[in-house]
Amino acid sequence: MKKYFFKSLANFCSILVALALVYPDAYGQTNKSAKNKTLIFFFDGLRPDYITAELMPNLYAFKQKASVGMHHHSVFPTVTRVNSASYATGSYPGTHGLLGNAIYFPAVNKSKAIGTTYEDLMKVQESESNQLLTAVSLGEVLQSAGEKMMVFSSGTTGQAFLQNHKVGNGAIVNPELILPESFKSQVLTEIGDVPQKGENGYGKHKWVIDALLKYGLKNDGPLVSAVWLSDPDGSAHRYGIGSKQAISALAFVDQQFGRVLDSLQTRGLTTVFNIIISTDHGFVTHTGKQNLTDFLISQGLKKDKDSDDVVIAEGAVYVKDHNAENIKKIVSALHKENWVGAVFTKPKKKGSMQGWVYGTLSFEAIHYNHPRRSGDILVAPNWNDEINDKEYPGTDFSRGVAGHGGSSPYEINIALMVSGPDFKSGYHDTLPTSNVDITPTLLGIYGLPVPTQMDGRIMSEFLKKTSEPARKSRKETIVTEVKYPWGTYKLSLDMSILDQYRYFNFSKVERIQ
């Protein structure tokens, strides 16, 4: 009897093993989602209206089958380095402390803002006791879980580095920065030297995708690969939105995206790769002539370009010793100027949406109130709906040909598309989402804890495996105004609210004579 029992038990176990091999999910093997890899793909400066069958056929076709975020947000200020740090940390600048493409750290330079190249960021890191960002990043969380992240970027060294600033067991591959240093010779040997800029500079995009195909898109590759192509941003800055050069750049980066999709298909990896598509910001046409530094000097509110009484870092204004009277004078002068849009200051009290200076809204309203690094004033250029010569709407009063950084819907409202084994197909999400939600969502997919300091949320509505009930968001408008002898300055800020999460949609200024 005992012999018969053990023989039967052995047969039963054999059957279970066979079934487990055929139906692994049903028999408690490692969570399937933990095996799926993720590709994050950013097209720098991608306006939603670029995604058409004519301009970007590969991305357009992808969008038809993907799930789409209909109400996705760039992080304000709508500049590249803010958004690379924000998506990487799942946090806003008020939390992670990287406040612009130009930044002010007096320990590095007392009288001027500095850039955000890798070399600049290393100076900041040294001056800040090795704490470049005051928030934990996706790369750090993955490394602590025994996983890794690789970044493939054709943009600036700073943008590439901020996506995984600790690097750890991962890597960064950029035409001007390869980390760790020990990986550099291997990349240059196997991928080849970075192409010369040439007429249009597109070679760097292909080189970066070559590296992705070699090191990222494979079964034993990193759990997360992040790609960031610096066009159409570069071409639109120089030649304008809708210019033939910008259209050509769109076509080229779309072809590179097509190469990635083809490679996933050829390698049989489409069923094990999630893909998240977005951008750092939209774009507007520029028509301005004013410069903030020159304006303050002309008004007697800053001594000269090299003085440290007032330091300008893009739209951020740092007033020496936080002198309240000088801050008020600067705000008053800005309110009168038609080229100036929204003006923000520190909160009237903790958590307040109103700024402490009359006629301003708070840094809290825009997630900008870093305890140590925020300036005293933040200024956005005024904007309108004017259409450029190529029929693209959205104009502001910054200098140059075209760009971003402001608080218009043309810069804040951006594309989001997701596809893959962990995401629903063909779902159109009307809830507000942001670039800060990307990292928490990935951590949710992989069953990793979301650090408490992260500001973003898990976009559970996109996930196949979700038990959360349907939710609704609401709109809210915050208004402030102040009267002057010349008239009234009125500032409105439109936001979407989902539970405890606030999303900045746009701001609008009226001057009433």
Which residue ranges define each predicted feature?
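Secreted, luminal/periplasmic, and some membrane-associated catalytic domains
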Residues: A34, M70, P77-V79, N101-K110, ...
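Beta-strand elements within well-structured catalytic alpha/beta cores of enzymes
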Residues: A34-P48, A61-K63, Y87, L142, ...
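Non-catalytic, well-ordered alpha-helical segments in soluble enzyme domains
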Residues: P48, Y60-A61, E140-Q143, E314-K350, ...
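His/Asp/Glu-rich, glycine-adjacent segments
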Residues: Y92, L98-G240, H335-N338, R511-I512
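Acidic, Ser/Thr-rich low-complexity intrinsically disordered segments
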Residues: T466-Q513
